[in-house]
Curated annotation (Swiss-Prot):
Disulfide bonds join 149-191, 183-224, 282-334. GO terms for cellular component: aleurone grain; endoplasmic reticulum lumen; vacuole. InterPro entries: Papain-like_cys_pep_sf, Pept_asp_AS, Pept_cys_AS, Pept_his_AS, Peptidase_C1A, Peptidase_C1A_C, Peptidase_C1A_papain-like, Prot_inhib_I29. Thought to be involved in the hydrolysis of stored seed proteins. In vitro, catalyzes the hydrolysis of proteins, such as azocasein. Shows a preferential cleavage for Asn-|-Xaa in small molecule substrates such as Boc-Asn-|-OPHNO(2). Transmembrane segments: none annotated. The mature protein is not glycosylated. The lineage of its organism: Eukaryota, Viridiplantae, Streptophyta, Embryophyta, Tracheophyta. Its main location: endoplasmic reticulum. This is Vignain. Belongs to the peptidase C1 family. Residues 21-126, 353-362 form a propeptide.
Amino acid sequence: MAMKKLLWVVLSLSLVLGVANSFDFHEKDLESEESLWDLYERWRSHHTVSRSLGEKHKRFNVFKANVMHVHNTNKMDKPYKLKLNKFADMTNHEFRSTYAGSKVNHHKMFRGSQHGSGTFMYEKVGSVPASVDWRKKGAVTDVKDQGQCGSCWAFSTIVAVEGINQIKTNKLVSLSEQELVDCDKEENQGCNGGLMESAFEFIKQKGGITTESNYPYTAQEGTCDESKVNDLAVSIDGHENVPVNDENALLKAVANQPVSVAIDAGGSDFQFYSEGVFTGDCNTDLNHGVAIVGYGTTVDGTNYWIVRNSWGPEWGEQGYIRMQRNISKKEGLCGIAMMASYPIKNSSDNPTGSLSSPKDEL
């Protein structure tokens, strides 16, 4: 118990430091073209963004438009704020093409065939805690970054598998997204999108998945490395789908384990989200895979989901976003209740191999 409390203190401190170290700007930075250029140069330095001279002028114009969007939105009375993150000199179309699937239309894959068991094990759950945070319970690894690869589906899958494995074994092991990107090809398409459900099925049928340290992420699609994938570390027994368009059912599932979900993450406010409870403009055109790792309620009574993203720790609240929960639309905010699923693990048993050792535990 003492160790878990210590871990949460460290996490809380990192959240505070992350906010303190985020890139900021002020009214005086918007006063002239020269001050805006200086702001752009500071932003490039902060995020280590390299541009050719010709490209810089084009990107500067995009940056200016994004600065004004962030500035004007933050002046509004909204329960969330935006910031100039690493996407600040990308148009929203470019952002969606790379990070929210519009380039390859992989949101269509989220509507594919379902492989779940057809049952919902949490259907008869009565009451649930007022709040749950699987990070506090030690079931969530550090935030990862998918890079410029449409592999969000793999990251969403891995968060859920890492979570249920920790719940069943009391051991947190970072698992390999790259194995899914390189090797899970029956329905999934690597950096061009995929389905979390199909990834769960792949892990089940294969008998498990290897660790992050054994098969590290490269942010690009490669040939499946057969020498690594047989070193299995964690197995699952299948997966189930949460009843569609039912936030109450989703709540029951998240109260018991992290859950993979698909959302519409293509809006400008989502692109530049910084902190607070996101209530912003979005639709139900599912284009991004994430994972819900908890839920809660603000002091003013706003219900929210704690959503783990895969755009690195500088995006949002140290890589997370709080999204409004229990809205009037049955699909949930940004379609969060439309396609949720989670892995099943019936026992603490895992493959007995070279990777079943303490060295991979976090």
